[in-house]
From Swiss-Prot:
Cofactor(s) the protein requires to work: Zn(2+)
Transmembrane parts of this sequence: none
Family: Belongs to the peptidase M44 family.
GO process annotations (BP): proteolysis; viral life cycle
Top-level EC class as recorded in UniProt: hydrolase
Descriptive protein name: Probable metalloendopeptidase G1-type
Originating species: Rabbit fibroma virus (strain Kasza) (RFV)
Bound cofactor: record note: Binds 1 zinc ion.
EC number in record: 3.4.24.-
Function: Seems to be involved in viral proteins maturation by cleavage at Ala-Gly-|-Xaa motifs.
Length: 590
């Protein structure tokens, strides 16, 4: 690790697939509380800009930090080009960027609204901790920010000026004189302390149960943010599933999730203890996303994480019991937060400023001081690869499992690939639990992508498909049939979601071209993401949720590279209507 004079920390991470990865602590959704919620997320969308033909890049905003990364495409750019590109998001010739024109901000706010719509249609993205800390359940920004459009340039400028050296963590895959010079002349020029220190009054958030959609019964227990507690949590994270951490307002919470309600109840009542046995040597081999989160969340970790290995493996037998004592003391005093699974649309007693409703109650749980049972947690095993075909009847369940456990989903033409550390029995236990089954069915919008895909690739009518909705994934398995487009180029339907999808054909269509279209639509504020699957040579199935379906359709139908197409445009309504979808697609069975 290299530390600049202003406090910027630079790590060489040869195992990452990113040429440069930059994180900024104290710069996430929490920063917006008391101001305009969504400012941090808006800034992320404005800053990131790159040539999709030369680079792969992305950015994200979390509760307490923001992160940005960029990597070069081999043969089209170099790692140094990627580093220069990321630096250009923050710095221009005059130094740190300060100018944000209203004309550009407007389209990014529209993009934020599309992201909100996407995340609420497909995922459960509500943040219980930020809500309890006086934020909203969703803090990523909404279309209502347009009401303060003229104020946003100055607000964004002030936010940029709040960036300081000690808040910056940088990972680079390779470090040489050129890269070091680029970093020193840019991030190395940031101030070492803020010009102003805002006065914030922390909101007490302990002793609450919040009822919201969740695949598990989750308890967030506040513990002291000491170095030994942090290292102990990292040990538990390496050994066990469903153990993690959260930070809010500089407070540290150990999160422990339970599949069964009786285990959750016995833990809170004190009648059961958790089996926190460290049965193997700790290695601290984490991915770069986890490491970035860790360095940004815990400023007390001032060295490379591997420098702590000897301390951990020498003292783990005393560190873990100390953390346990802290956990049980907080449980006894009620200093914890519970996320209790609830899927009712009518049950609520509070609402945030965006009128998202939920249930929040006090924890009035009597603690028993004599535990009689021990709860064994799910252990992490060696890495396994799980491949699920689109034809698998449990496809959606596995997707929800991966999302609920924060696992990356890799897609290809025939299915998805998930890398995990679960045993077969543990996966079966989760998938068969009543709470998880309710969770996986609580967001049906994702099914529309496969309903329409099945219509295009199979010989089934839309009526047949709707009658077998529960097994629709099986119906849309990868057929070897030849698809011939008919005369009708558009179907208008009504569903519970607003989206545009369809099949598009053209001799020059490539995945790179579709990726470029996605970014152009994003910059126009028309979509958040675009999913596509190649059905056969030069023919793709496209799907995108959008609150502007007509604008997206007009853009797609004006692309000259699409020589043939059939578009499905869905208007959001309370009642579904697929009656317009008469089979005009010819399937040549083979």
């Amino acid at each position: 690790m290299i530390v600049f004079d202003n406090g910027v920390r630079v790590f060489i991470n040869t195992s990452t697939n990113k040429d440069i990865y930059v994180g900024i602590s104290g710069f996430g959704f929490e920063k917006d509380i008391g101001g305009i919620l969504g400012t941090a997320h808006l800034l992320e969308h404005i800053l990131i800009s790159f040539d999709v033909s030369r680079f792969i890049a992305n950015a994200s905003t979390a509760r307490s930090y923001m992160s940005f990364w960029c990597t070069s495409i081999r043969g089209r750019s170099t790692p140094v080009d990627a580093i220069r590109t990321l630096i250009s998001w923050f710095f221009d010739r005059d130094g740190l960027k300060h100018y944000f024109p209203v004309s550009k901000i407007k389209y990014h706010i529209k993009e934020l609204e599309n992201e909100y719509y996407f995340r609420n249609e497909v995922f459960h993205c509500m943040d219980a901790l930020t809500f309890l800390a006086n934020g909203d359940l969703y803090n990523g920004g909404r279309l209502s920010m347009l009401d303060r459009l003229d104020d946003m340039p100055l607000i964004l400028q002030d936010r940029m000026c709040a960036i300081t050296g000690p808040n910056i963590v940088i990972f680079v895959r390779e470090l040489n004189d050129v890269v070091l010079s680029l970093l020193v002349s840019t991030f190395g020029t940031l101030p070492s302390c803020p010009l102003t220190i805002p006065c914030t009054l922390p909101t007490p958030i302990g002793g609450k149960i919040i009822m919201m959609p969740s695949p598990f019964y989750t308890v967030m227990v506040r513990v002291q943010p000491s170095l030994y507690n942090i290292l102990s949590i990292l040990c538990l994270y390496e050994i066990y599933h469903l153990v993690d951490y959260e930070t809010v307002n500089n407070k540290l919470y150990v999160t422990i999730s339970f599949i069964h309600e009786h285990e959750y109840e016995s833990f809170l009542h004190g009648s059961a203890r958790l089996n926190f046995t460290i049965y193997k040597k700790i290695r601290l081999h984490y991915g770069d996303d986890f490491l970035m989160n860790m360095y940004l969340s815990f400023p007390c970790i001032r060295h490379d994480i591997f420098d702590y290995l000897t301390i951990i493996n020498t003292n783990v037998s005393t560190m873990i019991p100390s953390l346990e004592q802290n956990i049980y003391q907080s449980i006894k005093t009620g200093d914890y937060i519970v996320v209790y699974p609830n899927f009712s649309n009518t049950m609520s007693n509070v609402a945030d400023r965006q009128l998202h409703k939920t249930v929040v109650i006090d924890t009035n749980i009597v603690y028993v001081t004599k535990p009689t049972t021990v709860i064994d947690l799910m252990k992490k095993h060696t890495h396994n690869d799980m491949y699920i075909k689109y034809s698998d009847t449990e496809f959606i369940d596995y997707v929800q499992l991966a999302l609920g456990l924060r696992r990356k989903i890799h897609k290809n033409v025939n299915g998805i690939h998930i890398r995990h550390q679960f045993s077969a029995d543990d996966i079966k236990t989760i998938l068969e639990s009543e709470t998880f089954m309710k969770y996986s069915k609580s967001k049906p919008a994702a099914m529309y992508q496969y309903l329409i895909l099945s219509f295009f690739v199979s010989g089934n009518t839309i009526e047949d498909i709707l009658q077998h909705r529960e097994s629709v994934i099986k119906l849309c398995r990868t057929y070897k049939n030849k698809i011939l487009l008919g005369k009708q180029t558009r179907y208008d339907i009504q569903t519970l979601s607003s989206f545009v999808c369809g099949i598009f054909k053209g001799p020059s269509i490539t995945s790179e071209y579709l990726t470029d279209i996605m970014w152009k639509l994003k910059r126009k504020g028309l979509i958040y993401s675009l999913e596509f699957v190649e059905l056969q040579k030069n023919m793709f199935y496209l799907f995108m949720f959008t609150i502007y379906p007509e604008d997206v359709t007009s853009y797609l139908t004006s692309r000259k590279l699409f020589t043939s197409r059939c578009v499905v445009v869905s208007k959001k309504c309370n009642v579904e209507d697929f009656s317009s979808m008469k089979k005009d697609i010819i399937i040549k069975l083979r």
